[in-house]
């Protein structure tokens, strides 16, 4: 690989978000064969991002196999495009949530309900959660630290999916208090990659709380709320996969991210 990287790149560019992309094509058959041999020695690969897209691709492939019972396994529908990274070269960032309203609750009742499962601390400035089991919340122009009660974390720790902080938030706040049953389809929730920062959460909450009236004044729509998450750990992700379970939607934000559309996998019969 180091020899190939000394050659002229097929593509070399910087995207609008400042991420540099360099692509080399390996066409030499001996090099390709050597890489295939090395990959055969890799004991396991894990889907770190795009779990639900991968599952959809598998379903499409299986349906095409049913439609073409004479398939031999070399057809393009037997494959889907992916990129592999060593786990040491991946960084998982927080994947945060913004909910556009409090589901008919006033802020005081909402805070009171949260205290059943969390210790709540007022913050003087925006910060990200430092440890697992903590969630930072932005509500009413103020930041709060939510620390899950020890007995709650202990009860959930035996299940690798329930032990995830994103599952904790969904099961204790988003679902029962804010009425977010399916975060994949509910239009009241937004997901914000941690690379955007905490100020982006404040901005979005403000956008959903206030609107410009016809006379130019600000009209209050109602309280919105944001949740800043502690990043999912690599070991947590691997543990879920090793138990043959599926990661919840929007549970990981990975860097680096390849620019979509650089490579296209065409599926033909």
PLM segments and residue spans:
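Surface-exposed, charge/polar-rich loops and edge strands
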Residues: 1-210, 218-269
